[in-house]
Regions:
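SAM/dcSAM-binding transferase cores
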Residues: 1-31, 167-224
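SAM cofactor-binding core of SAM-dependent methyltransferases
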Residues: 33-92
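A short acidic, Gly/Pro-enriched loop at the edge of an enzyme's catalytic core
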Residues: 96-105
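Short strand-turn motif at the edge of the Rossmann-like AdoMet-binding core
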Residues: 111, 146-150
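Glycine/threonine-rich flexible loop motifs
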Residues: 116-124
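A short glycine-rich, Lys/Arg-flanked "PGG" loop and its adjoining helix->strand segment in the class I
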Residues: 125-139
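Conserved Class I S-adenosyl-L-methionine
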Residues: 128-131, 154-175
């Protein structure tokens, strides 16, 4: 697993796990307020946020090496310094590496819906692991989600609506700042329906009843 910043690339073994929030701020030029994007793909939205809000910190998680490297190259070329990009499996990183309750906003756009029933265990959102995503939010933080796979979107809606301390609303139409990802722009052009959700955290994040280690075990059961 690779940790990339404006200053260079590192191995995950170079850092304590879970990553301390102060350590993240040090990696991103002293940033205070944080946003995280899980599965940032080619990095269109993540880079835009970095450039638009240079005093905030942005953490991106992406498993595909080509996409992570593309974002890193573009961010360095634009001389953005307020970001950290982690290359690795999102469920593992959320359960074992990322701090809890640190993000003012979390973004999950068009995650793989794994439509075949035998692959559902690989989904980012399911009853065992929804708290890994929701648990990233600080009190008052917001989670933004979009998918074109409507059945999966309905499942995510139900999971978030039933999660303690979250208030969930459906978004009608585009985000206020327009399409946020390449997929979203493409699907809008094709006229494909998109389900968008916004959830607000009213309290500190919950956690798996048995704690972080149980959440990690649930993650690896999904991969088995």
């Amino acid at each position: 697993m690779i940790v990339s910043t404006a200053a260079g690339d590192y191995g995950l073994a170079d850092f304590a796990a879970p990553l301390p929030l102060a350590g993240l701020a040090g990696l991103a030029g002293g940033a205070g307020r944080w946003e995280v994007e899980i599965g940032f793909g080619k990095g269109r939205y993540l880079l835009r946020r970095c450039l638009d809000s240079p005093l905030d910190g942005f953490l991106g998680v992406e498993q595909v090496a080509e996409y992570q490297e593309r974002f890193v190259a573009r961010a360095r070329r634009r001389r953005a310094r307020n970001w950290v990009a982690l290359r690795g499996e999102a469920l593992y990183l959320m359960s074992a590496v990322l701090p809890r309750g640190f993000a003012a906003a979390a973004h999950v756009y068009f995650p793989d819906p794994w439509p075949k029933s035998r692959h559902h265990k690989r989904r980012l959102f399911d009853p065992e692991t929804v708290d890994l995503v929701a648990g990233l939010l600080a009190p008052g933080g917001r989670l933004f989600f979009a998918t074109d796979f409507l059945a999966y979107g309905e499942l995510v809606w139900e999971l978030l609506a039933g999660y303690p301390g979250l208030t969930v609303t459906r978004r009608d139409g585009l985000w206020d700042d327009g399409p946020r990802t390449n997929y979203e722009a493409k699907y809008i052009a094709l006229g494909r329906p998109i389900l968008r959700l916004e959830a607000s955290a009213e309290a500190p994040p919950a956690l798996h009843p048995l704690g972080r280690e149980a959440a990690l075990a649930a993650t690896w059961r999904k991969k088995a």
